[in-house]
Structure formats: C-alpha cells, structure tokens
C-alpha cells in the first residue's frame, strides 16, 4: 500500500475504473475505451500494514453483528406469537433481512465493499476482486460478528430464544436434504449474481447512477429469496448468519444439517461468479493487450 490508505469500493474492487459522466451516450466507444482492471493478487502482504485493511474487517464485523441482531430479534418476535395476524409474519422477516442488507451495504460499501456474507466474499474472491488475505480476514470477522449478534439476542431473552429455535437454519419437515441444498444453491446464486451485476465495473464506468443504487437491488434480492425459501430452510444464503445462530443456540438439530448452509451458499456463489465472469462478461475470451 506504500503508506497510502485505499478505500475498498463497492464490490471490493479497489482499482479506479470510472469514466467521465456522460460517456453512456457514446455507445460502442465505451467498449473500446474501457479496460478491465487487473485481477487482485492472491496474496498482498502490504495489506497487513495498512489501517484500511483492518478498518474494513472491523466494518464487516459490526455490520454482520447488527444484521444478526435485528434479523434474529425479528424472528423471535414472530415465533413467540400464537397468531400470525398479530405479528409481521414471514413477509416481515423477509423485509428485516432484505432491509438490513440494503442499509448495511449502503453504510459499509465505501469501507469494506459491504459483503456481510462469506458467500459474497467467496464469489468475489473467485472473480479475483480481492486477495485471499482479505477474503479470509473478512470471513473470520463476519463469523465473529454473527456469533456476537446472536449472543446479544439470547442475552436479552434467553427463554424465548431457546424455546423458539434461536433463529437457527434447519431443513423443515417435509423437505429432504437435497431440497434444502438446492434452495440454498439457487438462493445464493440469485444474491451473488445480483451483487456482480449491481457492482459491475463496466456499468459503473458508463452509468454514474449505478454505484449509488447498488444496495437497493442487493437488499431486494435478499428479501425475495427469503420470501421463497423461509418455509424450506429458514433461508441461510449466508454461512456466517447460519453459523452464528447455530453456535449460540447449540442444540443437536441445529447442527444436523448445518453443512448444507455452507456447501449450498459456496456452490451458489461459485456458479454466480463463473456465470458473470465467463458468460456475461466473457473475460477469459477477451484479448489481452
């Protein structure tokens, strides 16, 4: 980093890519002038000496802490009611997850990239948008934040927390493990593909409004996936969220199918990264000058 702090832009791409406002009307000229940024190095030792590196990790910790705190608290509020009409219901839970992602991505995008999810970090790493060093640091901080967030909820209302499943992800009765795995793969694919599309460097260079609006489609994707898959798995699509709730709840059934909420999201994230980079952007097929 050579003594300089560099904020990580949305999508964890620190390389400058913006073109002057107004170039969208130039059409094909944009494609000719635009150059792909170089991939992030696998290891970047200089990051470990930069305050911006640790600041980004702290931002991921705090964001994931707040995410788990609000969302698990919402789940507990719905679970304790005997009547669905007296609570916000599944729609309210979905809104709490999607709304928090919208708010937290907006707040942390300029600091850490606003990942708040190991699957998002993994997908961006596969696309070489950030180094392995940063990816591992983010995932550790996300998991720690999730554990702390779920722990605070349990501390507030332990009886309710332990009596209503603690917000832990499990495959619902009537569904197989394959159903749960498939729901997690597809749900995470939708989320990570939305992240790639909303933070695409080429679109950002062409359309100045894209970076500003990016948190909105990401949060909305989380909302829609939760609406669809809460009845199946409680919706993971975020290994840190699943791990934090499972550790604090710590009952056998929370761990029985826990692997699904790591394997599924990581497969979904990998497929989204491959689809965007290879099919949509065709980066491997572009001539290198």
Swiss-Prot record:
Which segments carry the region annotation Disordered?
1-36
Short motif (NPA 2): ranges: 238-240
- Ubl conjugation as a keyword of this entry, yes or no, is no
Membrane topology, as annotated, equals:
Multi-pass membrane protein
A single GO BP term for this record reads: protein heterotetramerization
Q: What is the tissue localization of expression for this protein? A: Highly expressed in developing tassels and at lower levels in roots, shoots, ears and embryos. Expressed in the root growing zone at 5-6 mm from the root tip. Expressed in xylem parenchyma.
Pfam family, any one: MIP
Q: Which residues cross the membrane?
A: 58-78, 93-115, 136-156, 178-198, 212-232, 260-280
Report the main location listed first in the record. membrane
Entry coiled-coil feature ranges: none
Keywords from UniProt, A to Z, are: Cell membrane, Membrane, Repeat, Transmembrane, Transmembrane helix, Transport
Name the SUPFAM superfamilies for this protein.
Aquaporin-like
Cellular component aspect of the GO annotation? cytosol; endoplasmic reticulum; plasma membrane; protein-containing complex
| Motif NPA 1 location, chain numbering | 117-119
The UniProt GO MF terms for this protein read:
water channel activity
Q: Which InterPro entries does the record cross-reference, listed alphabetically?
A: Aquaporin-like (IPR023271), Aquaporin_transptr (IPR034294), MIP (IPR000425), MIP_CS (IPR022357)
Subcellular location field: Cell membrane
Q: What does the comment on domains in this protein's record state? A: Aquaporins contain two tandem repeats each containing three membrane-spanning domains and a pore-forming loop with the signature motif Asn-Pro-Ala (NPA).
| Listed NCBIfam families | MIP
Functional summary from the UniProt entry:
Water channel required to facilitate the transport of water across cell membrane. Active as heteromers with PIP1-1, PIP2-1, PIP2-4 or PIP2-5, but not as homomers.
UniProt lists the family membership as follows: Belongs to the MIP/aquaporin (TC 1.A.8) family. PIP (TC 1.A.8.11) subfamily.
This protein's assembly is summarised as: Interacts with PIP2-1 to form heteromers.
Q: What is this protein called?
A: Aquaporin PIP1-2
Species assigned in the record: Zea mays
């Amino acid at each position: 980093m050579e003594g300089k702090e560099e904020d990580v832009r949305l999508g964890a791409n620190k390389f400058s890519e913006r073109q002057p406002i107004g170039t969208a009307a130039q059409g094909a000229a944009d494609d000719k002038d635009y150059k792909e940024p170089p991939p992030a190095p696998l290891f970047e030792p200089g990051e470990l000496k930069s305050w911006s590196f640790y600041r980004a990790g702290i931002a991921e910790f705090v964001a994931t802490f707040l995410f788990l705190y609000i969302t698990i608290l919402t789940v507990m509020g719905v679970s304790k009611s005997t009547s669905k009409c007296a609570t916000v219901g599944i729609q309210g839970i979905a809104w709490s997850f999607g709304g928090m992602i919208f708010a937290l991505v907006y707040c942390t995008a300029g600091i850490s990239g606003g990942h708040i999810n190991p699957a998002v970090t993994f997908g961006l790493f596969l696309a070489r948008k950030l180094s392995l060093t940063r990816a591992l640091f983010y995932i550790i901080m996300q998991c720690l934040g999730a554990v702390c967030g779920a722990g605070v909820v349990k501390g507030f209302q332990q009886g309710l927390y332990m009596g209503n499943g603690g917000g832990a992800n499990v495959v619902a009765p009537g569904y197989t493990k394959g159903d749960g795995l498939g729901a997690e793969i597809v749900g995470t694919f939708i989320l990570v593909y939305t992240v790639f599309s909303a933070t695409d460097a080429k679109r950002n260079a062409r359309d100045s409004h894209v970076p500003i609006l990016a948190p909105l489609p990401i949060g909305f994707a989380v909302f829609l996936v939760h609406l669809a898959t809460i009845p199946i798995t409680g919706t993971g699509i975020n290994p840190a969220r699943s791990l934090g709730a499972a550790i604090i709840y710590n009952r056998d059934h929370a761990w029985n199918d826990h692997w699904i909420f790591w394997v599924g999201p990581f497969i979904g994230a990998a497929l989204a990264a491959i689809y965007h980079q290879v099919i949509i952007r065709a980066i491997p097929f572009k001539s290198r000058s």
